[in-house]
Amino acid sequence: MSAPIPIAAGKHAVEDFVASLNPNQLVYFLCNVGDGDSQLLLLPVDPQGRRRILIVDVCTTKKVPALVDSLQQAGLIGAAAPGAGGEPDGSVALVVATHPHSDHIGGMNELLTKLKPRIGEFWDPGYYHTTQDYLDMMAAIEANPHIIYAQPTAGYKRWFGSALVTVLSPSVGLRNKFDTYGTEVNDSSLSLRIEFPAARAVKRDAGRNLVDKKATMSLILGADAQTLSWAHVLTDFPQLGPNSSDANRAIRAATGTDLLSAKVLKVSHHASKHGVNLELVERISPALTLVSTASPSGFGFPHNVAQELIREALQATASTPGMVHKPDSELGIFYTCDSEDGGGPLGSMAVVMGAGKATVWRFGDTVSQKITLANGRRWTG
C-alpha cells in the first residue's frame, strides 16, 4: 500500500458549490466511505424541467440518503411525489448494485426502504450471494412491485434524458457462468460508461454527424471489475483503427475513435493490483482518475503496482531514464482518503461536468460525517 501524499494547502478555493451549478451540468459525487463505494450522479435537467439522480452502490448507511436530502434542501431536486397507487415518481431514476459484496451494498437495504417513493429502476448483475446484506437487498426489491428490475450485460444502453448509460461489463460469457460460480464475484461487476449530452438521431446534421461532439463528455465507473472482466471489455468495445471508408467515418462521427475513452475514470476495485492494467488506462485516457479507498485500508489499497501503472499510463516515463512522475494531484489522480498538508481530510468529491470541462470539488468530510454542500471547495491545481 502507498498512502496518498497530502496535497499542499492553498490548492482549493472556498466558493459556493450550489450557486456555481447550472441546470445543464452533470454532477458526479464519489463519497468518502473508507473501504467501499458509494456514488451518486445528479443528471442535467430533463425536458420536463426536473433533475433526476442515479445511485451506484451504497457502502454504508446514512451517507447517500443524507446527500439526497441535502440536494433536495438545496433545491437541486424536488420532494418525493409518489403516485396515488404508490408508484414511485422516478426522481431517483436508477439504483445500481454493481455486485453483491458488502462494501458496495451494505447500506442498500436502508436506501431502498427510505427512497422507495422515488426509485424507478434497479439493476444488479444477477450474481446470487449468501450474505445477509444481499438477501436483505433482494427482499426489499422483491417487496416493491413498482420498481423495474433488470440484470443487464455488456452492450446494454439506457437513456436518461440527455445522458446515456452503457453497460461495459459483465460480458455475456462471464454472465453465463454465474450460476456455476465459474465467475469470481468481483468479475460479475456492472461497470458503466455514462455519456452526456448523448445524441440521438435528431441530434445529427444531414451527414449524420453529431451536431456538437466537442461538448460530449463521458465517465467510466469501474465497480470492482478485475483484469479478466476488463479483457472482455477491451474486446467487446474496440478501438477504431484508421480507415477512410464511409462506414468508418459514420461510426467515428457517432461514437468517436474509441468506445472506451472517458474524461473521468473511477478506478475499479479501489486501485487493487487486480483492478486495472496499463492498456486499459491508456485506452480510457482520463483527465481525472478517482479512487475510493480508506487510509489506512484494511485491504492494503491502493496497491503500489496499480498506482504506478496508472501514473505510467497518464505520464509515460519508462523509456526516459531518470524521469519521474509528477505528483498524483498534478496528474489528475485523487483519492477519497486525500488529506491536506497540515490540515484535515479532503473527503468526498464532486466532479461537475459540462461544456467539455470537468471541475473537482471537495467537501472535507470524514467517513462517518455526512456531506455538507456548503463546505465545498473547488480544486484550482
Protein language model features and the residues they cover:
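Short hydrophobic-acidic sequence motifs that mark active-site Asp/Glu residues
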Residues: 40, 53-55, 191, 218-220, ...
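Short, charged, surface-exposed secondary-structure boundary motifs
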Residues: 65-67, 130-136, 298-303
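Catalytic metal-binding/acid-base residues of hydrolase active sites
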Residues: 34, 59-61, 101, 128, ...
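Alpha-helical scaffolding within the catalytic cores
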Residues: 35-39, 66-67, 106, 246-251, ...
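Acidic/histidine-rich helix-loop elements
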Residues: 58-69, 176-180, 236-246, 269-273, ...
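Flexible, acidic/histidine-containing loops and adjacent segments that form or flank the divalent-metal
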Residues: 1-28, 33-34, 44-47, 73-94, ...
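Active-site metal-binding motif and surrounding structural segment of the metallo-beta-lactamase
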Residues: 44-54, 59-124, 252-272, 285-289
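Long, structured stretches of catalytic cores involved in phosphate-ester chemistry, encompassing
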Residues: 249-348
